[in-house]
A protein has these predicted regions:
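PLP-dependent enzyme catalytic core of the Aspartate aminotransferase-like
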Residues: 54, 58, 207-208, 212-213, ...
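PLP-dependent aminotransferase class I/II
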Residues: 100-184
Length: 247
């Protein structure tokens, strides 16, 4: 969001995290008379933390009551399909309630269509009209649209993706515990783990053909974000990391 904001010539305000997650109270207090957009990723990237529905609903109500339609809240739900069913909620009902809310979803994660660059947004007509004025005219090609429609109807694949991710997450977290590494419990398809010399570990992993994401740019120089893969991919990462750390 910071880069997107800067690219538009706007001024960004980064609100410090609380326990690696969103501090909604602090985010509300950070709103100024010049504020126009507030971004919330839920589950969050790169930490994987999650804000429960009740807290999000209270934040939306508070922002709308104080600022009306002047401040738009963007709720980025890119990783929502990885949530346990008991934690999921229907954010579309909030769109009906709040004219200042945009909910964004992507098919790049759980649906496996990252190469097609396709997703969608939910909002009331006032905001969708503004978005349609500035979006590129051919931003999603016909093949991507057809694939997206098919993917949205494939509940079986989505369930398998959820189950594979859940099992892989457990494997990674157990490995981190055996290695004595601190990690952040994740609600997404990745786990944030503290390895100390993250730059050095990342380079060593790359030499073994294992790609993870350094997050020093997010203020976490000792941490790596590790995406959850297939069982054999997870084991390859664990073996490489264990060798590098000498454990």
């Amino acid at each position: 969001y910071r880069l997107a904001t800067q690219a538009r010539g706007a001024r960004h305000i980064v609100v410090p995290a609380r326990d690696y997650g969103h501090d909604l109270a602090a985010m509300f207090e950070a709103i100024t008379p010049d504020t126009r957009v507030v971004f919330i990723a839920n589950p969050n990237n790169p930490t994987g933390t999650f804000v429960p529905a009740g807290e999000v609903a209270a934040f939306l109500a508070r922002v709308h009551a104080a600022h009306g339609e002047r401040v738009t809240v963007v709720l980025d739900e890119a990783y929502t399909e990885y949530l346990d069913p008991a934690l999921r909620f229907d954010s579309a009902r909030w769109v009906e309630q709040y004219p200042n809310l945009v909910v964004t979803r992507t098919l790049s994660k759980a649906y496996g269509l990252a190469g097609l660059r396709v997703g969608y947004a939910l909002a009331q007509p006032r905001l969708t009209d503004l978005l349609n004025r500035v979006r590129q005219p051919f931003n999603v090609n016909t093949l991507a649209q057809a694939a997206a429609i098919a993917a949205l109807g494939d509940a079986g694949f989505l369930q398998r993706a959820y189950e594979v991710n859940k099992a892989g997450k457990q494997v990674l977290c157990q490995a981190f515990e055996r290695l004595g590494l601190e990690y952040v419990p994740s609600y997404g398809n990745f786990v944030l783990v503290r390895v100390g010399d993250a730059a050095g570990v990342n380079l060593a992993l790359l030499k073994q053909g294992v790609i993870v994401r350094p997050v020093a740019g997010d203020g976490l120089p000792e941490w790596l974000r590790v995406s959850i893969g297939l069982p054999e991919e997870n084991q390859r990462f664990i073996a490489a990391l264990s060798q590098i750390l000498g454990t």
